[in-house]
Design a protein with these regions (language model features):
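Helix-breaking motifs and short loop linkers at transmembrane-helix boundaries and internal kinks
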Residues: 40, 72, 93-99, 110, ...
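Helix-to-loop junctions at the C-terminal end of transmembrane segments
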Residues: 60-72, 265-279
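Conserved MFS/SLC helix-loop-helix module at the cytosolic interface between two early adjacent transmembrane helices
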Residues: 59-98
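Cytoplasmic membrane-interface "Motif A"-like loop-to-helix N-cap segments
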Residues: 70-80, 274-289
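Extracytoplasmic gate region of multi-pass secondary transporters
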Residues: 28-29, 212-266, 358-363
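Cytoplasmic helix-loop-helix junction between adjacent transmembrane helices
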Residues: 103-142
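Helix-loop-helix hairpin linking two adjacent transmembrane segments in secondary transporters
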Residues: 137-186
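Juxtamembrane intracellular "pre-TM" segments in multi-pass secondary transporters
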Residues: 1-4, 186-218, 417-421
């Protein structure tokens, strides 16, 4: 089955907006050292800048999904693009910590509907068998926005300064949102977003959360991306520069490695998900165990690591990030179209909830383990702080195993038996 005419143009415009959203989302990660000086804060304060953004993103997932079900993807994603641009403009001009928190909240709120809107457009425009691969392709292209943050944003920031860097991001965000407004639409036969009226918000939320397959999606999304997010969104550059003794250029290069690994992992994950739908949970578990091993090997050493080992570590974390999108594939499998937006939002909360927990844990442990007033941290302090990430990892692993058992029971009730590996 071929996609309708115009599908590629719509997909390109939507992905461009998601690409810019990822640049907005990750821009603070390359500015962590500068943010400590600009806002006169310490580790917990710096963590709060990232947490405010990610927590708002997570909190807005279900409302954004409900708006998506009612209004369609175009309106909500364009509104999101404009909000993010306003947030970056505020970041450009303020040196107030309180206003910076507000700016990051705007960015998180604007970012919230973008990916699930692109996923809805893909499901509407393309044949079902192509959807998992195209959603992973969306993630791959979006991850290149993280590459832009690691290289281009870092270059502008270090060359021209804080205000020009964030001002440029604001202008680009408005331009891309305007371009998407002209190109993004639903197929003519699907202009009415759903054939059935959307459920009320909390009816849809309860129905989504009550479905074991959706809970498996939530916990899969919770478990897999937070390690990469903690490194890319905030703590990677300070760790590489102050604890591992790397230059800012080398730290940016390590974030590039993380991003490229994610981009290479995305299409492979999409193909495996499409070809082996009954093995999706094993993909999640394999990724989680590999990521845990990478952390253990890094944190076991009490001295700075050679660049190649840091690069391998970043590659493993980056490759695990796109596995989180398997969670959204569970939502598509277990949710009717009338509440797919809410179900996708519910699942998408998982990874960003674990990211909030992870970023806060690292910041809190760093501040407790370091001398009062410290604004840079030692390797031993970072080792202790990163070890705290075992907590969300264990919670996520238990969640995946339990919800997988319940999901397989539901499948068995429908006559579908998952064979042993």
């Amino acid at each position: 089955v071929r996609a309708p005419r115009g599908a590629t143009a719509v997909f390109a415009a939507a992905v461009a907006l998601y690409f810019v959203a990822v640049v907005h989302r990750t821009s603070l990660g390359v500015a962590g050292v500068e943010a400590l000086d600009r806002f006169g804060t310490q580790a917990t304060g710096l963590a709060m800048l990232s947490v405010a953004q990610v927590a708002m993103y997570a909190a807005m997932q279900i409302p954004a999904g409900h708006l998506l079900d009612r209004l369609g993807p175009k309106r909500v994603m364009i509104a999101g693009g404009v909000l993010m641009a306003f947030g970056q403009a505020a970041m450009a001009v303020t040196d107030s910590f309180a206003l910076a928190i507000v700016a990051r909240v705007l960015i998180g709120a604007g970012d919230a509907p973008v990916f699930i809107s692109v996923s809805r457009l893909v499901a509407a425009w393309f044949p079902p068998r192509r959807v998992p691969v195209l959603v992973q392709l969306t993630g791959l292209l979006g991850q290149s926005g993280q590459l832009v943050s690691a290289v281009a944003v870092a270059w502008v920031l270090h060359g021209l300064g804080w205000t020009p860097a964030f001002s440029v991001l604001a202008v680009i965000g408005l331009v891309v949102a305007g371009a998407a407004a002209f190109r993004v639409r639903m197929p003519e036969a699907r202009e009415q977003v759903t054939t059935a009226a959307p459920d009320r918000l909390w009816v849809a939320v309860r129905a989504s959360a009550a479905t074991a397959g959706n809970r498996l999606g939530f916990w899969s999304h919770f478990l897999t991306p937070f390690s990469a997010n903690v490194v890319a969104l905030l703590w990677g550059v300070p760790f590489f520069v102050t604890a591992q003794g790397r230059s800012t250029g080398e730290a940016s290069a390590l974030l590039v490695v993380l991003t490229i690994a994610a981009m290479l992992s995305s299409p492979v994950t999409g193909v495996l998900t499409a070809r082996h739908p009954l093995r999706r949970s094993w993909i999640v578990l394999g990724s989680a165990l590999t990521t845990a091993l990478a952390w253990v090997l890094l944190l076991a050493a009490s001295t700075p690591r050679p660049f190649w080992q840091l690069a391998v570590f970043c590659a493993v974390l980056g490759a695990g990030g796109p596995i989180s999108l398997v969670g959204l594939d569970f939502a598509r499998s277990w949710s009717p179209s009338a509440r797919l937006g809410v179900a996708s939002g519910y699942v998408n909360i998982g990874g960003f909830a674990s990211t909030v927990i992870g970023v806060l844990l690292v910041g809190l442990v760093l501040e407790l383990a370091s001398p009062a007033g410290a604004s840079s941290y030692t390797l031993d302090e970072f080792r202790l702080a990163f070890a705290a990430l075992a907590l969300p990892w264990i919670v996520g692993l238990v969640g995946v195993l339990r919800s997988r058992r319940l999901t397989r029971a539901d499948l068995a009730a429908d006559g579908v038996i998952v064979p042993p590996v």
